[in-house]
C-alpha cells in the first residue's frame, strides 16, 4: 500500500488522518498483543512484570534508528527537534541504562532470544525504511517500537509453548 515514490510515501505519512491500513494494522497488533500477553501471564510466574522488562528493552532497540538512518525529511519539516538530532554520548548512556536496568533487575535467560529477535526485527524495519524513504520519520520511530515489542512478546510466547 501507500505511495510508489519516496515523496508520495512521505506525503502520506505527513497526513494526520488514519487510513484503512493504519486501522487494520493497529487492530491486528493490539489483538495479537492482548492474546500473547494473556497467554504469557498464565504461563510465566510474575508474568505481570513482563512489560516492565519488554517496554524499555524494545524502546532501547527501536531508538537506535538514529544511528542507522538519517532523518528522511528536511529538518525544518520536523515537528520535534529531538526526532532528527543524533543523541549525545550521555543520552546514549542513559538510553542503555534505562533500557537494560529493568531487564537486569528481573533477569531471566528466557528474555535473551526475544530481545535478539526484537533487535533483528528493528534492523529489518530499518532496511525497509532505508529502501522506501532513505531515512526515518517520527512515524517510523513509533512503528518500530510497536513492532519490536510485539516480536519480543511473540518470541517469548513461542518459547513458552514450544
Language-model features, listed with the residues they occupy:
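Aspartate-rich (DDxxD/NDxxD/DxxxD) Mg2+/diphosphate-binding motifs
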Residues: 1-20
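Hydrophobic alpha-helical transmembrane segments
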Residues: 5, 21-162
Amino acid at each position: 500500500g501507500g505511495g510508489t515514490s519516496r515523496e508520495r510515501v512521505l506525503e502520506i505519512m505527513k497526513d494526520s488522518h488514519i487510513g484503512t491500513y493504519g486501522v487494520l494494522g493497529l487492530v491486528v497488533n493490539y489483538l495479537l498483543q492482548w492474546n500473547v500477553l494473556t497467554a504469557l501471564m498464565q504461563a510465566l510466574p510474575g508474568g505481570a512484570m513482563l512489560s516492565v522488562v519488554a517496554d524499555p528493552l524494545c524502546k532501547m532497540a527501536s531508538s537506535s534508528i538514529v544511528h542507522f538512518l538519517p532523518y528522511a525529511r528536511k529538518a525544518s519539516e520536523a515537528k520535534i527537534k529531538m526526532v532528527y538530532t543524533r543523541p549525545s554520548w550521555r543520552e546514549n548512556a542513559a538510553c542503555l541504562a534505562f533500557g537494560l536496568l529493568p531487564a537486569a533487575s528481573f533477569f531471566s535467560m528466557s528474555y535473551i532470544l526475544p530481545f535478539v529477535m526484537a533487535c533483528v526485527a528493528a534492523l529489518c524495519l530499518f532496511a525497509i525504511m532505508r529502501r522506501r524513504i532513505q531515512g526515518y520519520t517520527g512515524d517510523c520511530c513509533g512503528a518500530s517500537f510497536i513492532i519490536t515489542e510485539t516480536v519480543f512478546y511473540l518470541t517469548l510466547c513461542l518459547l513458552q509453548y514450544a
